[in-house]
Amino acid sequence: MKFSFFALKTMLIELSESQTRQQLDASSVFTALLEARAEAAVVRGSMIWREIDGRRYLIRTSTAGAQKSLGPESSETQTIAAKFFDRKERAAERLRQLTEQVVVMQRMNRALRVGRVPNVVVETLNALEKAGVAEHFLVVGTHALYAYESAAGVRIPDGAMATRDVDLFFDTRKGVKLFSSLGRLDSSMIALLQKVDKTFRVRHSSKYTAVNAAGFEVDIIRRVARDGDPHPLRMSDDEDDLWAAQVSSGDNILGARPFEE
C-alpha cells in the first residue's frame, strides 16, 4: 500500500497526554540504561594481586584474558584497586536497577500502546548496542519512521508501517573498527542476530539477508564501493556470515544528517 505525504499527514493520530508522558519517561530510562552499559563496560574485567620475584604487583585483567601490570604494591596501587572495585560495584548495581526499570517501562508501554516498534527490531538493536557495534549501523527505510513518529508524538497509519524486514545501513568507512570489535568478541553478525532469535539464518540466495523462522528479515546494506572500500564485503571472518549489499542511495544516506531519538 502506498501513501502520499498529504494522505499520511491527514491520517496521523496524535498521542494522548498520558501516552506522551509515558513515551518521554520510557525514553529517559532507556537513555540512562545506555549510559549505565557504557559505564559498566569501562570496568569490565578485574584486578588481581600477584607475587612476582618476592613482590606483589597489581594486575589489570580483561575479559579476553589480557593482563597488564599497574605496578608493585603501594599505597597508590592499593587506592587504584579500591577505587576500581568500588566503581565496578556501583556500575553493576546501577545497571541492574535500570535494566529492571526498563522492563517495567516496557509493560507500561504495552498497556498504553506506546513504543510499538516490533520486538525483533528492538532486540536486534539492543544486541548491537550490547556488543558495542551499534554505532556502525543506521536503521533506514520503513522502520526508521518509528523514530519520527515518536519525536512528533503521533502514530503513523499501520498500513504505511507494514513490513517484514528491517534495513541496517553499514558505514564501510568504519569497517576496520567493526571487524576489530567482532574479532574481540569472537563473534559475527549472524551470531549476534542468533542471540536475539536462534532461528536466524543467512539466506543462501541473498547473502545480505538473515531470516528467522517467522519470516522476518534483517538486511545489511552499504554504499556502492569506492575510495578503497572493500568489495565484496563479508561482515566478519566467519565464512558463514552475512555480506553487505551495495545500494545506489548509499552516498545520499551517508551525506544526510542522521535522525536520533
What label would you give each PLM region?
Residues 1-56, 62-64, 69-261:
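Compositionally biased terminal segments of proteins
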